[in-house]
């Protein structure tokens, strides 16, 4: 009997098989947005068991377990690692239709040579087998990246990070995977957060004057950007609940900042103006340095107050947001473009309802000599939607409104060192989609041409777009 994960998994016709095996399969991986720990890579972390590797910090799995009524002690509580793995194994069969089902079995197959399906009957054998392998050489954090043919990844880093771990990795000639930092200044943007003033204090009292009329007073924040640039950073990353845009001069922005510093609660309009001013300032700085700006738009964070107090952030209690997007996004990009200060910008929309809105918007702000300067990327998997169907919809929407071949490829957005099978998953979906177009007579059977598009979407577009490792990049 053929195993569930086989060489033609998800490839539903001969055209898809040719495109995947001849053009996509062997390409390196560029994972330009993830949440891996640079410290764990620098130390080449070893994992004691599969619970550490698989379940530690993976709130996608936690959400699935909670949906089945699993007790929290088996998710984030004090149950033993073995008990937590067993609880996850019992959950897996009920995740059919969810990307977790496919990802789980792809990871078992690719890294541990396990063909069996994970469930209540097989969990102990798989637990013992995988744990035995984890104790061997070749199953450390770095080893998983090398096995996966990773070329470089982009981590997510606080402006206050000294990036010492990134530098230690870069100076190690035995490890060739590039670990590139990304500048994530959400703590400076979210002015109404209770932690805002404490964070600003850490940046230094000089930050208080950064919105005066002369741009030279923005030095505290600008200095961190330039520090990151010196350490190899070429990307910024912003998480935005909604897209702010309300025009605001430097003096007014400074007045709003001073009001917040003095302990006052800001109005929604004041918050929007501050965020707009800060984002525009940073975007212009990114442009001057040749950075890529990433905008993750539309996630409501920590919606369950009781569980947030109990477990903290990033534990599986975020949701897709709905709001007015077209006007503020167009206005923001236009404000930068009219001054020739729009950096390369990736717009991520969590809500599939905004696919056409964003795709039609980014088409307004392309540039001569830059392929896909402002692409759309739909973040997937984090809210238990069907990755496969959602990605097909996203790629089809992009093809309908824009240019499919400019898509900048896959990212994991993950905290796991075995998540790189998601790139394989994406590549199989892309090849199957194009293969289905050939099968239906919608595109010509030109494997060389279509194979080049597959390779661009899966690897070369990202390589060209980010220019990591290129002289000056």
From Swiss-Prot:
Catalytic activity: D-glucuronate = D-fructuronate; aldehydo-D-galacturonate = keto-D-tagaturonate
Gene3D superfamilies in UniProt: Metal-dependent hydrolases, uronate isomerase, domain 2, chain A
UniProt-listed InterPro entries: Metal_Hydrolase, Uronate_isomerase
Any Pfam family: UxaC
EC number per UniProt: 5.3.1.12
Signal peptide positions on this chain: none
Record keywords, A-Z: Isomerase
GO biological process: D-galacturonate catabolic process; D-glucuronate catabolic process
UniProt similarity note: Belongs to the metallo-dependent hydrolases superfamily. Uronate isomerase family.
Record's protein name: Uronate isomerase
Biological source species: Geobacillus stearothermophilus
Gene from which this protein is expressed: uxaC
């Amino acid at each position: 009997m053929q195993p569930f994960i086989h060489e033609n998994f998800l490839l539903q016709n001969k055209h898809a098989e040719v495109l995947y095996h001849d053009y996509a399969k062997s390409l390196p991986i560029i994972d330009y947005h993830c949440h891996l720990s640079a410290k764990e890579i620098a130390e080449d972390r070893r994992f004691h068991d599969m619970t550490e590797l698989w379940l530690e910090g993976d709130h996608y799995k936690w959400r699935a377990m909670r949906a089945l009524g699993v007790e929290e002690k088996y998710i984030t509580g004090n149950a033993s690692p073995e008990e937590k793995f067993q609880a996850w194994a019992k959950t897996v069969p009920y995740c059919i239709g969810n990307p977790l089902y496919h990802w789980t079995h792809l990871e078992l197959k690719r890294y541990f040579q396990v063909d069996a399906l994970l469930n209540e009957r097989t969990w102990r054998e798989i637990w013992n087998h995988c744990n035995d392998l984890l104790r061997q050489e070749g199953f450390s954090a770095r080893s998983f990246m090398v096995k996966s043919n990773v070329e470089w990844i982009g981590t997510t880093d606080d402006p206050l990070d000294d990036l010492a771990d990134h530098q230690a990795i870069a100076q190690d000639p035995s490890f060739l995977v590039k670990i590139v930092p990304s500048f994530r200044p959400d703590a400076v943007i979210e002015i109404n957060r209770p932690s805002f003033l404490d964070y600003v204090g850490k940046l230094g009292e000089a930050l208080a004057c950064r919105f005066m009329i002369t741009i030279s007073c923005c030095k505290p924040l600008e200095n961190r950007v330039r520090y990151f640039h010196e350490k190899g950073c070429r990307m910024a990353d912003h998480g935005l609940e909604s897209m702010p845009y309300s025009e605001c001069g430097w003096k007014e922005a400074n007045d709003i900042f001073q009001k917040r510093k003095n302990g006052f609660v800001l109005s929604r309009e004041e918050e929007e103006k501050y965020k707009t001013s800060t984002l525009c300032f940073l975007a212009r700085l990114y442009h001057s340095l040749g950075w890529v700006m990433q905008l993750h738009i539309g996630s409501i964070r920590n919606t369950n107050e009781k569980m947030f107090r109990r477990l903290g952030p990033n534990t599986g209690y975020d949701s897709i947001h709905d709001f007015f997007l077209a006007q503020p996004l167009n206005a923001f990009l236009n404000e930068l473009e009219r001054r020739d200060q729009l950096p390369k910008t990736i717009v991520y929309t969590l809500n599939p309802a905004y696919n056409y809105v964003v795709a039609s918007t980014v088409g307004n702000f392309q540039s001569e000599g830059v392929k896909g300067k402002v692409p759309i990327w739909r973040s997937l998997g984090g809210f238990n939607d069907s990755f496969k169907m959602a990605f097909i919809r996203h790629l089809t929407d992009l093809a309908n409104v824009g240019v499919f071949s400019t898509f900048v490829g896959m990212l994991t957005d993950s905290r796991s060192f075995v998540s790189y099978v998601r790139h394989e998953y994406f590549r199989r979906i892309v090849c199957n989609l194009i293969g289905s177009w050939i099968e239906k007579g919608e595109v010509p059977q030109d494997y060389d041409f279509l194979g080049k598009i597959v390779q661009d979407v899966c690897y070369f577009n990202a390589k060209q777009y980010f220019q990591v490792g290129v002289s000056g990049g």
